[in-house]
From Swiss-Prot:
One of its GO terms (molecular function) is exodeoxyribonuclease VII activity. The gene is xseA. Heterooligomer composed of large and small subunits. This is Exodeoxyribonuclease 7 large subunit. PANTHER family: EXODEOXYRIBONUCLEASE 7 LARGE SUBUNIT. Its EC number is 3.1.11.6. It comes from Shigella flexneri serotype 5b (strain 8401). One of its GO terms (cellular component) is cytoplasm.
Length: 456
């Protein structure tokens, strides 16, 4: 008896086509790691090879437009990581993969982990601009988290000494490469936040390969940077090196030297600002003196215009005209005119202006002297305040204390040594002098007994 519904009957071509479509649509693009064997490159430029492991193998093809982007020549026995599409070669029914990209297995796996972690943290919002903390301006203390023997530390200290020698720097030494490095970097960031000595941190190292920089692609380091209350400047490798730490940090600097430039002030620029302020002060004083002098000249001119001698000269002229007119008067008026002249002469003598002129001249001289004294006193006080400010700045500079022969010694934990009981034999010490640092090992500890005061 025949079944009620006939089963589907495939031709070979349709079967292979159906299987190919299933593989391409269901599997999609995958990452595969394996060992290369049977590698060939015909005249077409395409690559044909087999990927295998200990128990299986699969045929692979990588077309010319894709293999042009590969930066190395595949070798027999080489471990690689490929991104490929699974398909079926219909004419022979051979299952194979079409490779789109290829990387050496080590770097390829690291790159894959990098992309996965980057996508994860970005989805959580750790890269968002709203969480970026502004850098202090100016910074009062800089913390540096890096290897104490690396070139990055030397570059940072060199730039800071050149730009702002008085800026305090605290070093939190840590490994920056190897399995223990991520944990040490995290502890250094947490320690800097606990001690709260700095207002900005530089976290970084010099350049290297992807494996060398991998500590700064560690999720623990990224989350420690994000959680830091102190603003963090990342300075990992060269300008072309980009790590997860760069995305999480509050600011990314292309190199350690550039990070030092960002967090420091240019002392030469500060000096130019002081000089500019001094020039403006001198110009203001010159303007003030010129204005006072002009005002004094105006007052002096007005006083001259109202001088009693001028009034007397005008009256004298009028008197002469009257005398001329009286000389032509009638004889009967001469006596009366003479009497009137005598009366006028007496009144004029009683109103002699000389004492008033003398008092006015004395008052003017006093005003001139007081004005000169006030201007000299103000100029002297301004110069004295400026000199005191410069002297005070030089006196409070930490480098001035070091220049007088003093030094500061810190233990391995970064604490400043005040007593011998803070150290033990064999420990390493760091001594800060005027022109650099000295690292030394404690060989012997000799306490000094305090002298007893004599009782009288």
């Amino acid at each position: 008896m025949l079944p009620s519904q006939s089963p589907a009957i495939f031709t070979v071509s349709r079967l292979n086509q159906t299987v190919r479509l299933l593989l391409e649509h269901e599997m999609g693009q995958v990452w595969i790691s394996g060992e290369i064997s049977n590698f060939t490159q015909p005249a077409s430029g395409h690559w044909y090879f087999t990927l295998k492991d200990d128990t299986a193998q699969v045929r692979c093809a990588m077309f010319r437009n894709s293999n042009r982007r590969v930066t190395f020549r595949p070798q027999h026995g080489q471990q690689v990581l490929v991104r490929a599409n699974i398909t079926l070669y219909e004419p022979r029914g051979d299952y194979q993969i079409i490779v789109e990209s290829m990387q050496p297995a080590g770097e390829g796996l690291l790159q894959q982990k990098y992309e996965q972690l980057k996508a994860k943290l970005q989805a959580e919002g750790l890269f968002d601009q709203q969480y970026k903390k502004p850098l202090p301006s100016p910074a009062h203390c800089v913390g540096v988290i890096t290897s104490k023997t690396g070139a990055a530390l030397h570059d940072i200290l060199h730039v800071l000494k050149r730009r702002d020698p008085s800026l305090p720097v605290i070093i939190y030494p840590t490994s920056v490469q190897g399995d223990d490095a991520p944990g040490q970097i995290v502890r250094a960031i947490e320690l800097a936040n606990q001690r709260n000595e700095c207002d900005v941190l530089i976290v970084g190292r010099g350049g290297g390969s992807l494996e060398d920089l991998w500590s700064f692609n560690d999720e623990r380091v990224a989350r420690a940077i994000f959680a830091s209350r102190i603003p963090v400047v990342s300075a990992v490798g060269h300008e072309t090196d980009v790590t997860i730490a760069d995305f999480v940090a509050d600011l990314r600097a292309p190199t350690p030297s550039a990070a030092a430039e960002v967090v420091s002030r240019n002392q030469q620029e500060l000096l130019r600002q002081v000089q500019s302020s001094r020039q403006r002060l001198e110009m203001a004083m010159d303007y003030y003196l010129a204005n006072r002098t002009r005002r004094f000249t105006q007052i002096h001119h007005r006083l001259q215009q109202q001088h009693p001698q001028l009034r007397l000269a005008r009256q004298q002229t009028m008197l002469e005209r009257l005398q001329k007119r009286m000389s032509f008067a009638l004889e009967n008026q001469l006596k009366r005119a003479g009497q009137q002249q005598q009366r006028l002469t007496q009144r004029l003598n009683q109103q002699n202006p000389q004492p008033k002129i003398h008092r006015t001249q004395t008052r003017i001289q006093q005003l001139e002297y007081r004005l000169a004294e006030i201007l000299r006193a103000q100029l002297s006080a301004t110069r004295e305040r400026f000199g005191n400010a410069v002297t005070h700045l030089e006196a409070v500079s930490p480098l001035s204390t070091l220049a007088r022969g003093y030094s500061v010694t810190t233990a391995t934990d970064g604490n400043v040594l005040k007593k011998v009981k803070q150290v033990k034999a064999g420990e390493m010490l760091t001594t800060r002098l005027e022109d650099g640092w000295i690292e030394s090992e404690v060989k012997n500890i000799q306490p000094v007994k305090k002298s007893r005061k004599k009782v009288h």
